[in-house]
Each structure stands twice: as C-alpha cells, then as structure tokens.
Amino acid sequence: MSWRDDVLTVLERDPAPKSFSEALMFSQGLHAVLLHRISHRLYLRGQYKIARMINYWARVLTGADIHPGAKLGEGVFIDHATGVVIGETAVVGKNVNIFQGVTLGGVSTAKEKRHPTIRDNVTIGAHATVLGNITIGENVKIGAGSVVVKDIPPNVTVVGIPGKVVVKRDKERDRLREVRRESLPDPLLEALTDICASLDSMERRITSLEEQMKKP
C-alpha cells in the first residue's frame, strides 16, 4: 500500500477535503498515519532512536501519539488526530476508522503483548478507550466515550463504561432485509405505469373514433 492509497482513503471517508492536494496538505490524521508508517519501517529495522524521533515530531505536529511498534493495516483512517494514542503492541486491521481522543492502551508494564488487537472494518468513536491485550472483532462499532476492557465478538455495537454489547448485527438478516426492500413494489412507479397505460388506451380510443368519423 502506497502513501497515495492513504490519501485516497481520506478522500473516501472525509467529505471535508475537496481535492487530493488538500487532503495531503491539511489532514492531520493522514499526516499521523503517513509518519507512523515511516517510523514503523525504521522500528522494524532496529533503528529505534530515529523511529522514536519521527514519532516525537509526529506527536508535536498532529497531536496523535502512535508508537512506532504499533501495526496499522491498510485503509486505516484517523479523523481529527488530536488526542489519539496507540500503544507499542497494538495491532489495527484493515479499514478501521478512529476518531479523535481514542486510546488503544495497555494495563500492564510487562514486555509482552499488552495492547488491543482491532480486527478489520471497526469504527471507534471519539474519546473511546480500549485497554489491555484484548481483541475487538470484525465490523464492531464502539460508541463515543466508551471504555472497553474485554474481548468483543464480531458484528456488534458496544457502548458505555464499561463497554457493553447493545446491538448484534446479523449480516445475513441485513442482506435479506435489503433484498426484500428492493423487491417490494414501488407505489409511485406503479401509479405512473397505470397512468401511462391509461393514456395509451385513451389515445387508441381517440384514434378509433377519428377513423369512424371520417367514414361516410
């Protein structure tokens, strides 16, 4: 994934930037992601001090503190980077949306996996906190201000302190509901069809009457 893909991700999910160049120049969340990708590569090569230096200036410039050791997948979108904190052993999957003030933190000082794993297609609302070596399943939505401290299964919505599942999303049920909705008749379309049919019938009757009147 190139830096251009990260810019396109911003354009797809944020209506504010009007152009590629505007997103590239002024999106703090994008800057945080791009600078992290650079620092992460250096971190993996063992160039820890340079990686941490980039991390430091990224925090100063964007307001987001993303440890160089954290792993961010493709299509990660940070909207309003201010206050975002992502710890060293955090793993963030593909197409994850992160809003301002989000913390992916640890509850231990042990030299081991101590930060959350966020699966694909997750949305984390503003000022939500996810703590510990826990896993957030695919397609989960975490409400603004929530505090999550335990594993969350896929396809649910979580809110509150501590975070509780309030909505279970059944993808197959949603698909069938959409199919049924699409298959339902459109009253307006049916009415227009009836009107057009009536006009055709009237036109034929008028034509027939005109032909009869022409006969001697």
Where are these predicted regions, by residue range?
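Structural signal for interior beta-strand "rungs" in well-ordered beta-sheet cores
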Residues: 59-166
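Terminal amphipathic alpha-helical/low-complexity segments used for targeting or macromolecular assembly
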Residues: 1-58, 62, 173-216
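Short, well-ordered secondary-structure micro-motifs
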Residues: 169-170
